[in-house]
Amino acid sequence: MSLMNWFEDKRRFGGLIGAFIEKATKGYILNERERDKYIKIDTTKGLWTRCDSCENMLYVRFLKQNKRICEECGYHLQMSSIERIELLIDHGTWQPMYEDMVARDVLKFSDEDSYKNRVIFYQKRTGLTDAIQTGIGKLNKNLVALGVMDFQFMGGSMGSVVGEKITRLIEYAFKESLPLIIVCSSGGARMQEGTLSLMQMAKITSLLQFYQVRKKLFYIAILTYPTTGGVTASFGMLGDIIIAEPKAYIAFAGKRVIEQTLRQKIPDGFQVAESLFYSGLLDLIVPRTFLKGVLGEIFELYSLGVYKESNSYLF
């Protein structure tokens, strides 16, 4: 089935999460459940969880097999960066980069707890050094540079470490002429770092300009629930192709902030992926189960027609 036919089916069912996706997702779920009968789970964190959309109780073992998609309503629950790397990258090909980079508390920021203690807490909780993992790996045998933000680490907030790791990833992709994918999941800039976090927006954006315009290389932004604030206002919306997951919350400011500023009521659902897609702000909405295949097809098309400038290295 072509992508155009796929979208026509969604519109015919009155939305991108219609009966077609539900059936396809359930079929995928049954296949994965049979294949991964013995998947391991951490029983100390509980055996059951609840869907954020339909509130149906979900068995954690099946949920992991389902790529964290609710088998009742098709809602896409949040994934960790580790799970997303496993979803997108061919097994055994992932090479992480800059794992030892950690944030410094230069402002000595403190509210209910110090910033330093908060970082340590989330490092122990997630096993990550900060809110993003970067590296290179093969996606359907295509070598790509990949950055995956993790909302479980301080709400995926963008601080100096996140900005620097993305910057270095783009530099590496620039030098090696690799396509770039960034999976966004963030509450925005990290307030505990002040202007150091805000400047990451300009730093990443300016480097992407060289990457996309000067070197004619290919950047795909994948927006997941939630993508907000400074990430939306910078690299999140600069992809040559912008893909979102179904029903992903994508915004700059929250609904209440907008309503209080404009002093008028904002309609429900205007900041979800489907609304942005119909307004022309997104290129594709792709269910998680199909994402790797769709990206593989895009990279095949890209490899047939890519234009690369020679002798124009910035670094």
From Swiss-Prot:
Pfam families according to UniProt: Carboxyl_trans (PF01039)
InterPro entries: AcCoA_carboxyl_beta, Acetyl_CoA_COase_Trfase_b_su, ClpP/crotonase-like_dom_sf, COA_CT_N
Biological or metabolic pathway of the protein: Lipid metabolism; malonyl-CoA biosynthesis; malonyl-CoA from acetyl-CoA: step 1/1
GO biological-process terms attached to the record: fatty acid biosynthetic process; malonyl-CoA biosynthetic process
Catalyzed reactions: N(6)-carboxybiotinyl-L-lysyl-[protein] + acetyl-CoA = N(6)-biotinyl-L-lysyl-[protein] + malonyl-CoA
Leading EC class: transferase
E.C. no: 2.1.3.15
Domain CoA carboxyltransferase N-terminal: 47-315
Residues the entry annotates as binding Zn(2+): C51, C54, C70, C73
GO molecular function: acetyl-CoA carboxylase activity; ATP binding; carboxyl- or carbamoyltransferase activity; zinc ion binding
Zinc finger (C4-type): 51-73
Cofactor binding, note field: Binds 1 zinc ion per subunit.
Location(s) in or outside the cell: Plastid, Chloroplast stroma
Keywords recorded for this protein, A-Z: ATP-binding, Chloroplast, Fatty acid biosynthesis, Fatty acid metabolism, Lipid biosynthesis, Lipid metabolism, Metal-binding, Nucleotide-binding, Plastid, Transferase, Zinc, Zinc-finger
Required co-factors: Zn(2+)
GO CC entries: acetyl-CoA carboxylase complex; chloroplast stroma
Disulfide bonds: none
Family, as annotated: Belongs to the AccD/PCCB family.
Subunit structure and binding partners: Acetyl-CoA carboxylase is a heterohexamer composed of biotin carboxyl carrier protein, biotin carboxylase and 2 subunits each of ACCase subunit alpha and ACCase plastid-coded subunit beta (accD).
Protein's job: Component of the acetyl coenzyme A carboxylase (ACC) complex. Biotin carboxylase (BC) catalyzes the carboxylation of biotin on its carrier protein (BCCP) and then the CO(2) group is transferred by the transcarboxylase to acetyl-CoA to form malonyl-CoA.
NCBIfam families: accD
Protein name as it appears in the record: Acetyl-coenzyme A carboxylase carboxyl transferase subunit beta, chloroplastic
The encoding gene: accD
